[in-house]
């Protein structure tokens, strides 16, 4: 083995390995399945007779400690340790439901004959580049393994009983006099009996699959890989030279024709009809001619396939059970599983991803017959990062879904679903998880329905209740100043330009009118904004922060009649009955978790309130950016923001701008149609790499199917689905999920929005 990943397996054979990820084949609609199948056929046809390749599917048991570490939430010695333990317990229970105890990996190993490494290397690298491009066309993520990584894979296979970390360095070889084999070999091998072997403390047995079925099924390989025990499935494939393949088939047809003539002669001599010949002869003749036609005119090649399965276990009885289960799957598809007799050592070596086949049991198959063993089933989303959050379990495999939105190119997100499908609950679960795990992240919620207060109070956050009377939950004054300005408000040196844009949006919302503000009115407002912020920018003290009243007075001081018109429109919000936003901010907007409850603002103030909250959040995002902190922003009833042009355009700006500033906005809505109300608002969809889609109404399903290219089969997961069930879109991955949160917990009681449960809590 060399550091670049090239391995010499015989004196003249050199191999390399590529690891590739899964794609959603089983979840795809039939047209997509056909497209993947045809693309896989083209992939196989790339290999000529000089390149032998091996498809390896390695399902190994991982220690529960490995997964437990991934989902653990260590106590911090504060008042939240109780809910940390509760949430961690829920994750442990969900982990036990799935088969996350298995780590599933897929490899393609290819090899060529060459006189030496210098001759082999350029050709192997050229083949590797071509294969990576072919994987890319399939939409499959793939990467070549270097020497260390290949040794690591074989270490995990050969020492699966130890589950110890792989320790190796190329620098250790020369001083120690050891070879790479010494670092991957198990403590012992034992091949005493002809039908099984012992490898360290593990028992194993290699069998080969006899393909007897006249027709093969694309589920067969998937069923082998769905077994809940450690198993290694290997397909060694050797392409046959096309000219030789055609010659061989023609020779076989000639032999069959010769036999047919002999049978006809016998018939004539015996005095019966010469068309009556053995049925097998007629069948073989027709099949051979069809095979010749496929090879000559249907882009089919001939391959020799060796199909090996390695089962392992801790005890002989368990091994027999695993082999019996494997054999049952083979029989289900009219194939036979046969144990290798006195070839177990060769079988084990052939089961390692080395590209070396020592088992001379081969079956000739055409391209489409080999391709029916489609190496794709369903994707998994289980990230080991310290900030990966829980989003349910994979409905196809029952495995945990743990992902970190920060790893996406665009972490902006949407939570979509009909009333009662679990939208707000899903948002609260993510908020809680982020609060408990992502210790540096700040969380801000825009809450138009007053649903988040119990959770925020349990997390000791700040609930800012905005109402026309200006009174908070405890009756004390509660004010937010829309004129608040942070000096880091903009990318450039002039934060006032961006603040002026917000105030223009605010005035446009207040003044109203079908056509919005006229150019003259915009100019006047911009002029006044610069006047009222002059003192604060010269001396940025809190008491110098302007109020809406200062803008009103500046407008009154202007000569233009348009200024008087705007000032009059502002009057009700300054000296009138809706003057709740004409005060200095007097609440703590810097708490780690802040909820803006705007339920009681009323129809006149709610739109303005939502816009003011947006601006307050932007202030917080700019402060956090300087402190290298992430700001998670949740906008419930998001459709309310999209109904007005001003708040909609400001929301679109959030979706475009937040990523660069360390913000992660999440819109929560039941009205998908509002998300597509204009081309501008449609950008929110295009700038969201995370979509948590729960049950959808019929009309919305069709819109989403078209917008997100969802297949009918995928759509079934959001059709009349239960609470907490649906589809997760994470980057290019689509997974069906189920999230049933345990109801007998404190967290459930503070997160539920069901009236009867809220009342009882």
Regions found by a protein language model. Name each.
Residues 465-472, 690-699:
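Conserved AAA+ ATPase "SRH/arginine-finger" region at the nucleotide-binding site
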Residues 439-453, 467-468:
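Short beta-strand-centered segment that lines the nucleotide-binding/catalytic pocket of NTP-utilizing
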Residues 443-446, 595, 634, 658, ...:
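Structural recognition of the conserved hydrophobic beta-strand(s) that form the central parallel beta-sheet
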Residues 415:
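Hydrophobic anchor at the beta1->P-loop junction of P-loop NTPases
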Residues 1-378:
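Extended, folded cores of ATP/NTP-driven motor/assembly subunits in large transport
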């Amino acid at each position: 083995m060399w550091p670049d990943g090239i391995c010499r397996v015989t004196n003249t054979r050199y191999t390399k390995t590529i690891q590739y990820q899964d794609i959603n084949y089983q979840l795809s609609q039939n047209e997509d399945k056909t497209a993947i199948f045809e693309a896989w056929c083209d992939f196989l046809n790339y290999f000529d007779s000089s390149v032998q390749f091996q498809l390896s599917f390695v399902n190994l048991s991982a220690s529960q400690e490995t997964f437990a570490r991934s989902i653990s939430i260590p106590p911090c010695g504060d008042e939240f340790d109780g809910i940390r333990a509760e949430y961690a317990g829920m994750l442990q229970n969900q982990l036990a439901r799935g088969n996350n105890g298995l780590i599933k990996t897929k490899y393609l190993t290819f090899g060529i004959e060459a006189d030496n490494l210098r001759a082999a290397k350029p050709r192997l690298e050229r083949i590797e580049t071509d294969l990576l491009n072919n994987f890319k066309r399939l939409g499959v993520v793939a990467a070549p393994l270097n020497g260390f990584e290949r040794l690591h894979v074989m270490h995990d296979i050969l020492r699966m009983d130890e589950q110890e970390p792989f320790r190796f360095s190329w620098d250790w070889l020369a001083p120690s006099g050891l070879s790479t084999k010494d670092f991957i070999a198990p403590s012992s091998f034992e091949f005493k009996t002809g039908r099984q072997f012992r490898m360290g403390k593990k028992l194993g047995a290699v069998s080969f699959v006899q393909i007897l079925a006249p027709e093969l099924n694309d589920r067969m390989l998937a069923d082998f890989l769905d077994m809940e025990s450690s198993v290694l499935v290997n397909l060694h494939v050797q392409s046959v030279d096309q000219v030789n393949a055609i010659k061989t088939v023609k020779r076989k047809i000639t032999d069959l024709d010769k036999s047919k003539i002999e049978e006809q002669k016998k018939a004539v001599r015996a005095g019966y009809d010469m068309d009556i010949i053995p049925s097998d002869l007629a069948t073989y003749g027709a099949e051979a001619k069809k095979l010749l036609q496929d090879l000559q005119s249907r882009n089919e090649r001939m391959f020799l396939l060796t199909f090996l399965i390695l089962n392992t276990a801790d005890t002989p009885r368990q091994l027999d059970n695993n082999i019996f289960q494997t054999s049952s799957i083979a029989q289900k598809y009219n194939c036979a599983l046969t144990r290798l007799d006195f070839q177990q050592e060769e079988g084990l070596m052939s089961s390692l991803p080395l590209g070396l086949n020592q088992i001379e049991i081969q079956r000739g198959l055409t391209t489409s017959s080999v391709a029916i063993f489609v190496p794709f089933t369903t994707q998994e989303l289980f990230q080991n990062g310290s900030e990966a959050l829980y989003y349910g379990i994979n409905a196809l495999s029952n495995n945990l879904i743990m992902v970190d939105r920060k790893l996406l190119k665009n972490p902006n997100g949407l939570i979509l679903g009909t009333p009662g499908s679990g939208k707000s609950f899903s948002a609260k679960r993510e908020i809680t998880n982020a609060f408990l795990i992502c210790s540096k992240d700040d969380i801000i919620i825009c809450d138009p329905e007053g649903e988040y207060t119990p959770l925020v109070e349990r997390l000791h956050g700040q609930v800012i209740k905005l109402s026309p009377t200006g009174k908070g939950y405890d009756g004390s004054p509660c004010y937010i100043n829309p004129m608040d300005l942070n000096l880091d408000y903009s990318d450039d040196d002039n934060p006032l330009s961006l603040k002026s844009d917000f105030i223009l949006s605010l005035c446009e919302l207040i003044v109203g009118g079908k056509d919005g503000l006229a150019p003259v009115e915009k100019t006047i407002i911009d002029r006044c904004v610069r006047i009222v912020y002059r003192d604060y920018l010269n001396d940025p003290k809190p008491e110098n922060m302007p109020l809406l009243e200062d803008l009103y007075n500046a407008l009154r001081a202007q000569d233009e009649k348009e200024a008087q018109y705007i000032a009059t429109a502002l009057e009700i919000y300054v000296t009138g009955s809706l003057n709740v936003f004409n005060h200095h901010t007097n609440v703590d907007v810097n708490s780690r978790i802040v909820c803006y409850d705007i339920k009681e603002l009323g129809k006149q103030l709610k739109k303005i309130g939502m816009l003011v909250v947006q601006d307050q959040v932007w202030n917080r995002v700019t402060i956090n950016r300087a402190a290298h902190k992430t700001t998670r922003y949740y906008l419930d009833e998001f459709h309310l923001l999209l109904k007005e042009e001003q708040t909609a355009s400001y929301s679109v700006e959030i979706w475009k701008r937040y990523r660069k500033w360390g913000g992660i906005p999440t819109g929560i809505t039941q009205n998908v149609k509002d998300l597509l109300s204009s081309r501008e608002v449609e950008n929110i969809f295009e700038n969201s790499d995370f979509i948590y889609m729960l049950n959808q109404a019929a009309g919305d399903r069709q819109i989403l199917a078209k917008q997100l290219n969802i297949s009918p089969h995928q759509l079934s997961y959001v059709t009349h689905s239960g609470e907490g069930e649906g589809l997760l879109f994470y980057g290019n991955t689509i997974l069906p999920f189920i999230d049933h949160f345990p109801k007998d917990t404190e967290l459930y009681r503070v997160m539920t929005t069901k009236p009867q449960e809220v009342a009882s809590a």
